[in-house]
């Protein structure tokens, strides 16, 4: 007897934009309602920087505006590689413009490096010295918490991360860039679900600090304009995928069933049906399908 509640409200307005060949094209603004009106959208503009490294153009532009950037990539290796590349470029700029911040970054990096003498800790410290850190499940709990704290305090300029950050950590930034829209799955490269990309883009905009958030998607391909239109149509204006129960997978269902039996949760067969009929799976399929 539940009522469905829908809300498009956001504490900070969110501007969705496509980014290709250093050209930024705002497409949609989400606040109390969706809007594509020209007077609300920011005008298109071109960023300065090398076309071979568009992420740097995004971060460099954010530094000009005293902002921070979250960059989502497809793999842990990509997160580390991108962080190190950006770090080297930012370090050169900070040496000229903000040596005090560079010193604080170096002190923070040294403190992290001293806690754990591992190759991962060394790579993390190397990237932090230039104002960028990478964030993924391969880091220790202490490393992740230290990085998140430094980003929230404004010490770190950028953070490269895998999509797990979008699902599990409340870490907003003024600007979010989704660099990779595909990932390797079942032996082939597949596009990310709309739901997942929206989760990442939704990290843009810091309540109490920003008047709006910038949600950018990098569009790759020889026909940048065409790709950008397709990306906008799917990820900004397209419908979100339907939610399905993980218990619909036989291995997952079997695992939960055996665990419940082993821990004494079920005493007879009838209790099994009663339990699973009360789950999302039970609400999604017919009773006869559930019994089968």
What feature does the model see in each segment?
Residues 1-87, 128, 133, 137, ...:
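Conserved interdomain linker/interface between the two RecA-like ATPase lobes of SF2 helicase motors
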Residues 13, 81-89, 146-149, 172, ...:
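Alpha-helical scaffold elements adjacent to nucleotide-binding pockets in ATP/GTP-utilizing enzyme cores
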